[in-house]
Each structure stands twice: as structure tokens, then as C-alpha cells.
């Protein structure tokens, strides 16, 4: 199973240490510092809920004091461009949909937006998460948001942009 974990770091002075520690876990595919109500976002892969729970424990050991875990509904919309994991993201956009809606039908449209790297239907407080390529950062409105707005079923969004951390 895939999940996106939004986390709050205990002390601001340990943001980089926490990011480095979380990224070191073999079950964490990607992790970024973000702007907004959370400090860190991590895309994780687990074989079971107990394993997901142990990933959260490791995150806590590295300084993440609070988490919000959103599990991907792999039976619904779940698509990634080839090489997605190796590309830097400028933002993750969480989408709340109007009901009734069919996010599986969004796949073709979302993947026609060049800067969309992946889109996943979620269990949790948001319905869909979309990752946007780093290349869109300079003209985010025209390259992504303007196109997203054409989906009339989008009710609300929350955009979490990334810090660029040189390693």
C-alpha cells in the first residue's frame, strides 16, 4: 500500500535532521519540507497496516511529533508517470471533490497536464493528491492551476509547496 504522511516536526531547529532521518528509511520513497500547517510530507510504501505503523514510529524517532496519514485507494485513481519517483516536485496539491464524483475518470485529464507527475485517490480528509513537477514552480498558475480549474468537480484545494534543500 502507498500512503502520504503529513507531519509536524517538534523543533524548528531540527527540520533538516528530521528530513534526513526520514529520507533514510527504506520504506520512504520521497520526503520534502513543505510550507503550510505541516512541516514535512512523505510518500511511503508498506505491505500492511502494522508495517505502516512502524514507519510512523520511525518518523517519530526522527522528530516528527504529529502525523496525518492519507492512504492511497489503489482500486481508484492511482497513476504515476514513468520516472516520477526520481523527479523533484514543486508541490503536492490535495483536492476535495464535489459529490457525487468519479475520480477514476480524472486520470486521462490530469495526465494530460504536462507537469502532473502522479495522482492518487485517498482515504482521509482529502479525496485526491496530485504531485506537480519542479519545472512548474516559476509559472504555477498557468502551468497547473488554470488547467486544474477546468475540472468542475474540484470543490477545494490545499497546496503544499516544497522548500528546496540542497544536499
Predicted regions and their residues:
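A compositional/biophysical signature of low hydrophobicity enriched in polar/charged and small residues
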Residues: 1-167
Amino acid at each position: 500500500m502507498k500512503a502520504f504522511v503529513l507531519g509536524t516536526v517538534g523543533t524548528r531547529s531540527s527540520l533538516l535532521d528530521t528530513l534526513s532521518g526520514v529520507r533514510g528509511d527504506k520504506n520512504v520513497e520521497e520526503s520534502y519540507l513543505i510550507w503550510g500547517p505541516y512541516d514535512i510530507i512523505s510518500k511511503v510504501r508498506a505491505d500492511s497496516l502494522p508495517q505502516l505503523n512502524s514507519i510512523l514510529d520511525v518518523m517519530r524517532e526522527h522528530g516528527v511529533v504529529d502525523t496525518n496519514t492519507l492512504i492511497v485507494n489503489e482500486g481508484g485513481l492511482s497513476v504515476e508517470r514513468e520516472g516520477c519517483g526520481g523527479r523533484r516536485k514543486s508541490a503536492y496539491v490535495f483536492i476535495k471533490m464535489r459529490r457525487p464524483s468519479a475520480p477514476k475518470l480524472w486520470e486521462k485529464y490530469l495526465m494530460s497536464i504536462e507537469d502532473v507527475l502522479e495522482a492518487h485517490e485517498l482515504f482521509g480528509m482529502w479525496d485526491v493528491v496530485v504531485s506537480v513537477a519542479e519545472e512548474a514552480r516559476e509559472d504555477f498558475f498557468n502551468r497547473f492551476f488554470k488547467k486544474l480549474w477546468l475540472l468542475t468537480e474540484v470543490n477545494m484545494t490545499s497546496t503544499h509547496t516544497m522548500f528546496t534543500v540542497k544536499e
